[in-house]
């Protein structure tokens, strides 16, 4: 009897220990799953990843690229990210030639660019704001009026209900993605008559803000109180109106690669993993851009 009781006690103890062991394994697995989910949400972090990543292109994407660059390098201290702001056309040429890893473009890619093996990776949506100096009494235009201003048919603000003042039409240089998108969306490609063509978003913002009678266009995310953003067809340039499809002037922010993302090196793939993570998406929203639907 004593031997039987002893055997039962041993079996019970063993069963308890096995249950605890399996429970422990289950907890460890759940923890690993949770950690994996957390890692995916926060973006790829790899201290062993080392090397360099090069981007070039759109000046309109500077604010976004600098924010992503800083946060990505914090998570991946072994990687050096460099970005050159050379204009959308130049960025696409560079990635096509293989001289950079990623070409930044603030417009959709052309069929010819895609035919050269360049992949259009849309990372954000931006609005193009039409701006004037703060002393201008005209605060909204129809899209038809805007066309006529930039094609030279309307040259004085008095024709639009404003004061007798010459309109100074400011635009971007020919290779600019902002200009390409603006002219395409307005259907005035190669028809515009610019008083000045400037080579960066910041230059347009500064010139319009300091020039009486000036009008220009810039990325929505760089707007500040030095200029006034105009309503177009009665619609304000806001994220809500762009998402709702109400605002005419919106365009994609593209990080183009030569070939698909899964064909790229580990650093490029890690970059896009981060951009598409919850943390990366939060960075995109923080700089005033809209997430692709």
Where are these regions (language model features)?
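Exported/periplasmic ABC-transporter solute-binding proteins
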Residues: 8, 21, 26-89, 93-97, ...
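Sec-dependent bacterial lipoprotein signal peptides
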Residues: 1-23
């Amino acid at each position: 009897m004593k031997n039987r009781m002893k055997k039962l006690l041993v079996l019970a103890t063993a069963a308890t220990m096995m249950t605890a062991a399996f429970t422990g394994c289950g907890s460890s697995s759940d923890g690993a799953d949770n950690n994996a989910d957390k890692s995916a949400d926060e973006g790829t972090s790899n201290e062993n990843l080392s090397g360099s990543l090069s981007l070039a292109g759109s000046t309109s994407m500077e604010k976004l690229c600098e924010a992503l660059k800083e946060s990505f390098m914090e998570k991946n201290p072994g990687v050096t990210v460099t970005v050159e702001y050379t204009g959308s056309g130049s960025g696409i040429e560079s990635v096509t030639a293989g001289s950079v890893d990623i070409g930044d473009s603030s417009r959709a890619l052309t069929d010819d660019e895609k035919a050269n093996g360049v992949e259009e990776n849309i990372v954000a949506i931006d609005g193009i704001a039409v701006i004037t100096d703060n002393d201008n009494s005209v605060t909204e235009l129809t899209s038809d009026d805007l066309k006529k201003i930039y094609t030279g048919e309307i040259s004085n603000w008095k024709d639009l209900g404003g004061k007798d003042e010459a309109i100074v039409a400011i635009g971007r240089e020919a290779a600019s993605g902002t200009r390409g998108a603006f002219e395409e969306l307005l259907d005035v490609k190669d028809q515009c008559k610019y008083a000045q063509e400037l080579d960066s978003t910041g230059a347009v913002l500064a010139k319009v803000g300091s020039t009486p009678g000036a009008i220009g266009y810039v990325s929505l995310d760089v707007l500040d109180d030095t200029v006034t953003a105009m309503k177009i067809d009665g619609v304000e340039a806001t994220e809500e109106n762009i998402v709702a499809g109400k605002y005419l002037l919106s365009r994609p922010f593209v990080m183009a690669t030569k070939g698909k993302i899964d064909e790229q090196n580990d650093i490029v793939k890690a970059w896009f993993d981060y951009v598409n993570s919850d943390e990366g998406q939060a960075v995109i929203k923080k700089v005033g851009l809209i997430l692709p639907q």
